[in-house]
Amino acid sequence: MVRSDIIRGHLDSIILRLILEKDRYGYEISQEISNRTNNSFQIKEATLYAVFQRLEKKEVIEAYYGDVSDGGKRKYYRITSLGKAYLSELVKEWAEVKEIIDLFMEGLE
């Protein structure tokens, strides 16, 4: 398992990326994270909903209730245009961080 404190600072990026692909509800996002990481990282429900609240407050995502015919009245999240710009900034920031870390970690495998 990956230490959650390493990933924690990048949860906004991960969640925004998943919502960029398509509108999603909370459980779907947590399952997608687990699946894509082969269960090496699992997000706790409380953490996930805290991120949703923070992102909604920043107006980078918005919530709406899905149609009952889609399997119940689930709360879905979609990315806003502000969210797309924010995600773009986060991607650039990650590239810079990765470059710095790589400078110190190269050749240590």
Swiss-Prot record:
SUPFAM superfamilies: Winged helix' DNA-binding domain. It holds the Pfam family PadR. Transmembrane segments: none annotated. It comes from the Bacteria. This is Uncharacterized protein X. It comes from Lysinibacillus sphaericus. The lineage of its organism: Bacteria, Bacillati, Bacillota, Bacilli, Bacillales. The gene is X.
